[in-house]
Amino acid sequence: MTAILERRESTSVWARFCDWVTSTENRLYIGWFGVLMIPLLLTATSVFIIGFIAAPPVDIDGIREPVSGSLLFGNNIISGAIIPSSAAIGIHFYPIWEAASIDEWLYNGGCYELIVLHFLLGVACYMGREWELSFRLGMRPWIAVAYSAPVAAATAVFLIYPIGQGSFSDGMPLGISGTFNFMIVFQAEHNILMHPFHMLGVAGVFGGSLFSAMHGSLVTSSLIRETTENESANAGYKFGQEEETYNIVAAHGYFGRLIFQYASFNNSRSLHFFLAAWPVVCIWFTALGVSTMAFNLNGFNFNQSVVDSQGRVINTWADIINRANLGMEVMHERNAHNFPLDLASVDAPAVQG
């Protein structure tokens, strides 16, 4: 018997690295987008944790009145936040080497820009990594498309809005109470609750939650029993089996009788497309709404639009919202200006003497 030995071609370190990065056999897929994503998100997370614990106060309004946001400077988990960059910086790119010292960089809120820019690039790379893994496995690309909705929303809030307003100091603080403060100020300045794209976003979030709960409960309630009544129904299935685990006809029949026939899907692909598309499209619209309000194309304004025959204003709910908006606008940045912009820009009424 003759044995033939073949010499294995030696592959370079770079080739082996490429094979490892793009291998779908790894426990966690890395991918070329992952090579970028991992350091970006690690940087954003590390700086966020350190800043949340120990960052010194930041001169957010650019008026030499620093605002404390970290735990070591008197905050708790609820009130703590990474304070946005100073209005004195505006939307300038402000890396560490642009400041005269680390103290100056911290005082002007350099942490915020560093975290936000690394985070946005990181989540964009995560989306690319989803597409990359789908491509390697021969799957369709819609997982990454669905993830584009939260990526668009984060980009609108953390990047487009500050650009439109002219300063990263108008971005959302990275904390619990800071998020609510951002929402209140956004309503005061842009009347977002009266913007149709925000209304679509609310419908997407609440509707998506409702549809998810309905779908999950219907599927769980219509499992095809493969076991005896003395065993768990879960024991009758194995991961990756070809046979369906639930009876869509039974689920369709139940829901059709519960509401009406045409309110229920009888096609699994149509159903799951709808479950994915509804929240994704609605969040796309919300991101688009925030991006337009960034440039002050605001929500509907029906203030004092109802008057009687004598021209006297008949107050409506819109006027009450307007008064609430003015109150919120007066309260924020209270030391940066004497009047809210809406009041300061109106001509003073003539005084009869």
UniProtKB/Swiss-Prot annotation:
SUPFAM superfamilies (UniProt xref): Bacterial photosystem II reaction centre, L and M subunits
Binding site for pheophytin a: Y126
E.C. no: 1.10.3.9
Propeptide: 345-353
Site (Stabilizes free radical intermediate): H190
Phosphothreonine, modified sites: T2
Function: Photosystem II (PSII) is a light-driven water:plastoquinone oxidoreductase that uses light energy to abstract electrons from H(2)O, generating O(2) and a proton gradient subsequently used for ATP formation. It consists of a core antenna complex that captures photons, and an electron transfer chain that converts photonic excitation into a charge separation. The D1/D2 (PsbA/PsbD) reaction center heterodimer binds P680, the primary electron donor of PSII as well as several subsequent electron acceptors.
Binding site residues for chlorophyll a PD1: H198
Locations listed in the record: Plastid, Chloroplast thylakoid membrane
Processing and modification events after translation: Tyr-161 forms a radical intermediate that is referred to as redox-active TyrZ, YZ or Y-Z.
Membrane topology: Multi-pass membrane protein
Name of the protein in question: Photosystem II protein D1
Organism domain of life: Eukaryota
Cofactor descriptive note: The D1/D2 heterodimer binds P680, chlorophylls that are the primary electron donor of PSII, and subsequent electron acceptors. It shares a non-heme iron and each subunit binds pheophytin, quinone, additional chlorophylls, carotenoids and lipids. D1 provides most of the ligands for the Mn4-Ca-O5 cluster of the oxygen-evolving complex (OEC). There is also a Cl(-1) ion associated with D1 and D2, which is required for oxygen evolution. The PSII complex binds additional chlorophylls, carotenoids and specific lipids.
Record-level GO cellular component terms: chloroplast thylakoid membrane; photosystem II
Residues reported in the UniProt entry to bind a quinone: H215, S264, F265
Oligomeric form and interacting partners: PSII is composed of 1 copy each of membrane proteins PsbA, PsbB, PsbC, PsbD, PsbE, PsbF, PsbH, PsbI, PsbJ, PsbK, PsbL, PsbM, PsbT, PsbX, PsbY, PsbZ, Psb30/Ycf12, at least 3 peripheral proteins of the oxygen-evolving complex and a large number of cofactors. It forms dimeric complexes.
GO biological process: photosynthetic electron transport in photosystem II; response to herbicide
Sites of N-acetylthreonine modification: T2
Similarity comment: family membership: Belongs to the reaction center PufL/M/PsbA/D family.
Swiss-Prot/TrEMBL catalytic activity: 2 a plastoquinone + 4 hnu + 2 H2O = 2 a plastoquinol + O2
